[in-house]
C-alpha cells in the first residue's frame, strides 16, 4: 500500500532560515510542497522519509535565497493492482460504492464489480446484494460507514496542472465550468468470496 519513491527537486531556502540546520529547513520545505499531494503517475505523497544526497547550494543574483538540488525518498500511497484493502463506505450512487481509507477518498467500486446480483435502492440510496439462500433472496445493504474489504483492480491518474484558457473556453459562461476531476482514482472490486462488508463474513 505504501512505497518509498526516490525523487529529485531543487529546494529554495529563504535567508531568514540560514541560522537553522540545512537538513531541517529542506525537510520542512519538502513536506510543505509534497505532503498530501498527488504526483502524476507516482501516487499520493504522505511525507518525507529521508534525504539521501545534497548537492551544492547556489545563491542567484537578485535572490538572497539558497537553491539546493536534493535527492530524497518520499513515502507514497500507491497500492499495487490486486492488493486487498479495507476501507469504509463513504456513500453510494448509481455509479457504484464510494470508499474512503480516511486519508484517501477517491475509490470507486462500480456496479459490475459488486457481489451479484446487486441492485441500487433509490429510496435508501444504497447498493444491495440480493444474497440467495434456501429461504429465498436475502437483502444485504451496503450502508454508509460500514467497513468493506475490496481488491484494487485499476487506477487512474489525471493531469490536473493548470492550463491557459482556449478560445473556445472564452465563449462559455462560468456556470458551465467542467466538474473538477480527482488527480488519482482507484477502482475496486468485491465480486469474490470473502470480499465486501466485513460483517458479511464474520463467523459466529
From Swiss-Prot:
GO terms for biological process: defense response to virus; innate immune response; nucleobase-containing compound metabolic process; transcription by RNA polymerase III; transcription initiation at RNA polymerase III promoter. InterPro entries: NA-bd_OB-fold, RNA_pol_III_Rbc25, RNA_pol_Rpb7-like_N_sf, RNAP_E/RPC8, Rpb7-like, Rpb7-like_N. It is found in: Nucleus. GO terms for molecular function: DNA binding; DNA-directed RNA polymerase activity. Residues 158-175 have a biased composition (Polar residues). Residues 158-179 are annotated as: Disordered. The keyword Transcription applies. GO terms for cellular component: centrosome; cytosol; intracellular membrane-bounded organelle; nucleoplasm; RNA polymerase III complex. SUPFAM superfamilies: N-terminal, heterodimerisation domain of RBP7 (RpoE), Nucleic acid-binding proteins. Belongs to the eukaryotic RPB7/RPC8 RNA polymerase subunit family. DNA-dependent RNA polymerase catalyzes the transcription of DNA into RNA using the four ribonucleoside triphosphates as substrates. Specific peripheric component of RNA polymerase III (Pol III) which synthesizes small non-coding RNAs including 5S rRNA, snRNAs, tRNAs and miRNAs from at least 500 distinct genomic loci. With CRCP/RPC9 forms a mobile stalk that protrudes from Pol III core and functions primarily in transcription initiation. Pol III plays a key role in sensing and limiting infection by intracellular bacteria and DNA viruses. PANTHER family: DNA-DIRECTED RNA POLYMERASE II, III, DNA-DIRECTED RNA POLYMERASE III SUBUNIT RPC8. Component of the RNA polymerase III complex consisting of 17 subunits: a ten-subunit horseshoe-shaped catalytic core composed of POLR3A/RPC1, POLR3B/RPC2, POLR1C/RPAC1, POLR1D/RPAC2, POLR3K/RPC10, POLR2E/RPABC1, POLR2F/RPABC2, POLR2H/RPABC3, POLR2K/RPABC4 and POLR2L/RPABC5; a mobile stalk composed of two subunits POLR3H/RPC8 and CRCP/RPC9, protruding from the core and functioning primarily in transcription initiation; and additional subunits homologous to general transcription factors of the RNA polymerase II machinery, POLR3C/RPC3-POLR3F/RPC6-POLR3G/RPC7 heterotrimer required for transcription initiation and POLR3D/RPC4-POLR3E/RPC5 heterodimer involved in both transcription initiation and termination. This is DNA-directed RNA polymerase III subunit RPC8.
Amino acid at each position: 500500500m505504501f512505497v518509498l519513491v526516490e525523487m529529485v527537486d531543487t529546494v529554495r531556502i529563504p535567508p531568514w532560515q540560514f541560522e537553522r540546520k540545512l537538513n531541517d529547513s529542506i525537510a520542512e520545505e519538502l513536506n510543505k510542497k509534497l505532503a498530501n499531494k498527488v504526483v502524476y503517475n507516482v501516487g499520493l505523497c504522505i511525507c518525507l522519509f529521508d534525504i539521501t544526497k545534497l548537492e551544492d547550494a547556489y545563491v542567484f543574483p537578485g535572490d538572497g535565497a539558497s537553491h539546493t538540488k536534493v535527492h530524497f525518498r518520499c513515502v507514497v500511497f500507491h497500492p499495487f493492482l490486486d492488493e486487498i484493502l479495507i476501507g469504509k463506505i463513504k456513500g453510494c450512487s448509481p455509479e457504484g460504492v464510494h470508499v474512503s481509507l480516511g486519508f484517501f477518498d477517491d475509490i470507486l467500486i462500480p456496479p459490475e464489480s459488486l457481489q451479484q446480483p446487486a441492485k441500487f435502492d433509490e429510496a435508501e440510496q444504497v447498493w444491495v446484494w440480493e444474497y440467495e439462500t434456501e429461504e429465498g433472496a436475502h437483502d444485504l445493504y451496503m450502508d454508509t460507514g460500514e467497513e468493506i474489504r475490496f481488491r484494487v483492480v485499476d487506477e487512474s491518474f489525471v493531469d490536473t496542472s493548470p492550463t491557459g484558457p482556449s478560445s473556445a473556453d472564452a465563449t462559455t459562461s462560468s456556470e458551465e465550468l467542467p466538474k473538477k476531476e480527482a488527480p488519482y482514482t482507484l477502482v475496486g472490486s468485491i465480486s469474490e468470496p470473502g470480499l465486501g462488508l466485513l460483517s458479511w463474513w464474520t463467523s459466529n
